A protein has these predicted regions:
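Conserved catalytic-core segment of NTP-binding enzymes
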Residues: 92-187
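Switch II (G3) loop of P-loop NTPases
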Residues: 80-98
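Short beta-strand-centered segment that lines the nucleotide-binding/catalytic pocket of NTP-utilizing
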Residues: 34-48
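Conserved lysine of the Walker
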Residues: 19
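Hydrophobic positions on the alpha1 helix immediately C-terminal to the Walker A/P-loop
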Residues: 22, 26
Length: 235
C-alpha cells in the first residue's frame, strides 16, 4: 500500500453541464504540477481525444463493462489522480455501481480518497441529483460543486437547497467563469489541449487572450480555495 493518499475524482450530475470541460481544466492544472493522471470516460464521443497523447484515456461503460478495470488501477503506484467521468442523469445507477463494487471500502483500504465533483447549471435537476448522491454517500466522500457561469450567475436553486448544507458536510464550491461561445467553440475545434490553444496562431489574438484568462481564473479558483485544493489535488 502506498503511504501517500491519492485521489479519485468522479464527475457526477446532470448532462451537458460541463463535466468534461472541468476535467480538462483540472488535467491542465495537475500536469502543471507534475502529477500523473488517468481518465475513464463513459461517453463514446471522444471528448478527451485531445488529451490522449498526454494522459491515458480509457473508454468504459460502467454499467455493462467490468468495473475491476478501475479497481485494478487503484493498485498502480504511478498514478496520483484518476478521473471517472460518469454519465449524466444516471445518479441511481452510479450509486448502484459504487455499492456493488464496494467502492468505499476498497478506496479506504488502498489509501485513496474519493471526491464527487459536480458542475451545476441553473436547473433544479442538478440539486436533486446532488442531494440524492449525498444521501447515499454521506461522509464516505468529499464534495465539490462547480458553479458553471456559462449557464447563469445566480444559481437560485443551489442557493435555496444546497449552499448552506455544503459546509456542514465539509464540502465546498468553486466558480467556472463563462467563456463566450465563439471562443469556446474555436478552442474545441482545434482539438488540442486547452493550454496549447492560447498559443494557437490560427485563433484571433483576442480569443487567445480570453482563453488564457479563462484557464487562469479557474486555476486560481481551485488554488485559492483551501478545501477545493485538497479535494481536487493528490496530497
Amino acid at each position: 500500500m502506498s503511504p501517500v493518499c491519492r485521489r479519485l475524482v468522479m464527475t457526477v450530475g446532470d448532462s451537458r453541464v460541463g463535466k468534461s470541460t472541468v476535467i480538462k481544466l483540472l488535467i491542465e492544472l495537475f500536469l502543471s504540477q507534475n502529477q500523473t493522471v488517468k481518465i475513464y470516460n463513459h461517453d463514446n464521443r471522444n471528448k478527451f481525444k485531445a488529451y490522449e497523447g498526454i494522459v491515458p484515456v480509457e473508454s468504459l461503460n460502467f454499467f455493462t463493462d467490468n468495473p475491476d478495470l478501475v479497481l485494478d488501477d487503484l493498485l498502480n503506484d504511478s498514478l496520483d489522480v484518476i478521473f471517472v467521468d460518469m454519465p449524466g442523469q444516471y445518479i441511481q445507477e452510479t450509486c448502484n455501481y459504487i455499492y456493488e463494487a464496494d467502492f468505499f471500502t476498497v478506496l479506504a483500504e488502498l489509501n485513496w480518497k474519493l471526491t464527487f465533483l459536480q458542475p451545476i447549471s441553473h436547473r433544479s435537476d442538478c440539486m436533486e441529483y446532488f442531494l440524492q448522491l449525498l444521501d447515499f454517500a454521506t461522509d464516505n466522500a468529499n464534495y465539490v460543486i462547480v458553479k458553471n457561469q456559462h449557464f447563469d450567475t445566480r444559481f437560485k436553486e443551489y442557493n435555496q437547497l444546497v449552499q448552506q448544507k455544503l459546509p456542514l458536510i465539509g464540502g465546498t464550491e468553486i466558480r467556472l467563469t463563462a467563456l463566450h461561445r465563439d471562443h469556446y467553440q474555436g478552442m474545441e475545434h482545434l482539438s488540442k489541449p486547452y493550454s496549447q490553444c492560447f498559443h494557437e496562431q490560427s485563433l484571433y489574438v483576442l480569443y487567445r487572450s480570453y482563453i488564457y484568462h479563462w484557464l487562469k481564473n479557474f486555476f486560481d479558483a481551485v488554488k485559492n480555495n483551501q478545501v477545493a485544493s485538497i479535494y481536487l489535488e493528490a496530497v
